[in-house]
Amino acid sequence: MNGKQLRRWDTDSNGRRFEGGINDVAVAANGGAYATVFGPYADPPIPTSVIGKILYLAPGGQKWVEVANDLNYANGIGVSPDQKTLYVSQTVSNCILKFTIEADGSLSNRSNFALLNLLVKNRNDSPWLGPDSMKIDSKGNIYVAQWFGGKVLKLSPEGKLLHVFEIDAGDGTTNVAFGKNEDLYVTVVQDPKDTQAKGSIVKIRNVR
């Protein structure tokens, strides 16, 4: 790995630009990839429309194809270990959705997986409070950062809240990554309202 750019996409299969930008990507075991299109971010930053999307790039494919739409600011995304379920964060809804992954990579059976406002209380009432990026462990547990929440939630494959990791470094928890020895690394923006987005990386030991 040398950081060389292998390919770049600026539009989907219909030639449409990714409004709001590509937010997150998850790669399936077969080499296919799913990406979220966030939607417009207004100035001042007030949620404006529900037009987030999920795109799919087939193994060896050249074009990103829309496989889900009408998402309330599509954000983090992950594939279950058995490759049968796709999870996606709807940040503004403070909700995680799940889909069945079909053999051709398309998605079906859209449903609510976890309504985070029913699982955990937050002191922040920002309209942007909600799930950000996620990672899924080998047991199918979901670790999701909560933007404006200052925490990482651990959810079971059934949507049960298993643990809340409070992050003292700031309210803008954005992403998580697994490390050695069952450690979890968390990226954090100290103040989500700070236009400079000053942040840090936090290490949590023995999370799994």
Regions found by a protein language model. Name each.
Residues G52-L55, C95-L97, K151-L153, K198-V202:
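A short loop-to-beta-strand structural motif that recurs across blades of beta-propeller domains
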Residues S13-Y34, G39-Y41, T48-K53, W64-T85, ...:
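Beta-rich, blade/repeat-based domains predominating
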